[in-house]
Amino acid sequence: GSKTTQMAAMMENDGYILANELDKIRCDRLKYNVHMQGAEIVEVINMPGENVGEKYPNTFDKVLLDVPCSGEGRFLVSDEKTYKNWSTKQVQDLVEIQKKLFESAVEALKAGGEMVYSTCTLNLKENEEIVNYAIKNLNVKVEEINIELKDKAKGISKGYDTSLKNTI
């Protein structure tokens, strides 16, 4: 819920945010956090993200698509618990879900809208390959991001659409 409440704060609690969480326990926790932070512009729903675009077509100016991922960015070599359940099958299953979520998010965006695609993983399949899929199949484009981040790395574009160099 921290991304949701941070966006509400950045918007000075003016506007509207629809936050969707599939997991019921996490959804209830998000509702609680939103309430405790006084983020009155946030409506929290609990539905499959793949259905959001169909229910809310051409509705949103901006979408933050924070997808479920393999979490490779959180692996600690010193802690086997952080990676013991990782598998290539899990990654492939997540890729299929991520594509469906991306399609739904694009459907929910107004024409000319902006979307941020977010993961906490490091692999190409869940990052560059998903965005490349969207460029080729969903009529989206990647815009350059001018933001100062410590240790920022450009996206990999070799073998993909050249605009992927603008991803971080």
Identify the function of each model-found stretch.
Residues 1-168:
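S-adenosylmethionine
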